[in-house]
Amino acid sequence: MASIQCIERVYSCTVIYDDFIRINEEYVLSNDRRIASLTPCAGRCSTVFGDSVCRGCRRFNHEVIRWNTFTPEQQTTIWKRLDAQLDQILVPMLPFADLKHVEGFVLSKRVRLRDDASRGRKLYQALKICEKNKNFANESGLGIQSQQVKPIWQEFERRVLALAIASYDLAFLRADSISERLIHLAEEE
């Protein structure tokens, strides 16, 4: 049983699984039933250092912590908020992007996208690939040159993080206001 628990911890964040197989008296995850789960994680979570909003994926800290406990509907709500932020910031920054070309480029790099991924999400994935290797800029469909990748990425990161933090602050203020009203109503009764 200890080996199963260890394997569960290793795969719980990245894999949804149904089944183990037994090999040489040990339980091992069966590759036949493994399905990679899709999360907004960008692989550089800053919430572990105390940030309220992750600098990588821009989820709120409680969303990062509880992601695997959320229902698909709750996860979709979060994805939509994140995609709306990408649409608001990135789409105007890349006015010459050819979406069909971008989609083909992203798929050719084996990046998985949700079926309902927004235009901004697709542009983000392409720009992220180019940020790692600016030589892909010309083939990306983003309508930018390789020397533009870094400045666009840096400005995008600055703007989208500011928007995500403002979104968090607004959500916190709303929750605080609702809390105060509930306390006031309870005191009146």
Q: Model-flagged regions — what are they?
A:
Residues 5, 86, 127, 174, ...:
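Generic low-complexity, intrinsically disordered sequence content enriched
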Residues 1-2, 6, 118, 182-185:
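Extended hydrophobic/Leu-rich segments
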